[in-house]
């Protein structure tokens, strides 16, 4: 499979950012560029089509030149709703989802997930210590199951990924690449480090 053309990259920026005081995390500046743009740029080196899932400040995200897709379900039901919304509005078979607050994803993310997925419809990153189910390669085939899961009021990403028949892919050699920004203090530390 030609990864560049058969996988749609998606920056997930649709959350409420409660731990950041409600500030839209994707728009926070890291070394002169918004967090979401770091993720989009990393995805664009691996894939030819990248979109953004955002529920606030869509015009700002659109100014970055990428298509912006809003959740089709109301009340910010979480990252799974963003995944569903993108699958409902994009024609691709495979999707690579990454949260907007993971600006240092590795350059071989798509290739490694694809290589290790075997026949699974869903694979996600495991950094050697913990799962990162929102950094995931997902096949369109799970869309009906995902819709049913969300309509039943479920929101747990990891539980859904397992229900869908997925498995983790080991990225313990890139553990630091998956640290995300959850607080203003963490963002300040990143500004100092990189």
UniProtKB/Swiss-Prot annotation:
Record carries keyword Cytoplasm: yes
Subcellular location: Cytoplasm
Enzyme class: transferase
BP term (GO), one: bis(molybdopterin guanine dinucleotide)molybdenum biosynthetic process
UniProt-annotated binding residues for Mg(2+): 101
Cellular component terms (Gene Ontology): cytoplasm
Binding sites annotated in the UniProt record for GTP: 12-14, 25, 53, 71, 101
Keyword field: Cytoplasm, GTP-binding, Magnesium, Metal-binding, Molybdenum cofactor biosynthesis, Nucleotide-binding, Transferase
Catalytic activity from the UniProt record: Mo-molybdopterin + GTP + H(+) = Mo-molybdopterin guanine dinucleotide + diphosphate
Chief location of this protein within or outside the cell: cytoplasm
EC number assigned by the record: 2.7.7.77
Pfam families, per the entry: NTP_transf_3 (PF12804)
InterPro entries: MobA-like_NTP_Trfase, Molybde_CF_guanTrfase, Nucleotide-diphossugar_trans
Family annotation (CDD domains): MobA (cd02503)
One example GO MF annotation: molybdenum cofactor guanylyltransferase activity
Cofactor(s) needed by this chain: Mg(2+)
Domain remark from Swiss-Prot or TrEMBL: The N-terminal domain determines nucleotide recognition and specific binding, while the C-terminal domain determines the specific binding to the target protein.
Function: Transfers a GMP moiety from GTP to Mo-molybdopterin (Mo-MPT) cofactor (Moco or molybdenum cofactor) to form Mo-molybdopterin guanine dinucleotide (Mo-MGD) cofactor.
NCBIfam families for this protein: molyb_mobA
Binding partners and assembly: Monomer.
Family affiliation: Belongs to the MobA family.
Name of the protein: Molybdenum cofactor guanylyltransferase
Organism of derivation: Escherichia coli O157:H7
Gene name of the encoded protein: mobA
């Amino acid at each position: 499979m030609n990864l560049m053309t058969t996988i749609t990259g998606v920056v997930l920026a649709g959350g409420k950012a409660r731990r950041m005081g409600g500030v839209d995390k994707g728009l926070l500046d890291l070394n002169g560029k918004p967090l979401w743009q770091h993720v989009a740029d990393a995805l664009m080196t691996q894939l030819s089509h990248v979109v953004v899932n955002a529920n606030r400040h869509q015009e700002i995200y659109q100014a970055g030149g990428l298509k912006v897709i809003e959740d089709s379900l109301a009340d910010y039901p979480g990252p799974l709703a963003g995944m569903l919304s993108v699958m409902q509005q994009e024609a691709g078979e495979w999707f690579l989802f990454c949260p907007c607050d993971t600006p240092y994803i590795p350059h071989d993310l798509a290739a490694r997930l694809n290589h290790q997925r075997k026949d699974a419809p869903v694979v996600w990153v495991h950094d050697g210590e913990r799962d990162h189910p929102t950094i995931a390669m997902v096949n369109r085939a799970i869309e009906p199951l995902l819709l049913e899961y969300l309509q039943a009021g479920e929101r747990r990403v990891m539980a859904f990924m397992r229900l869908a028949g997925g498995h983790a892919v080991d990225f313990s050699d890139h553990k630091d690449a998956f640290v995300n920004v959850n607080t203003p203090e963490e963002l300040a530390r990143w500004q100092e480090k990189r």
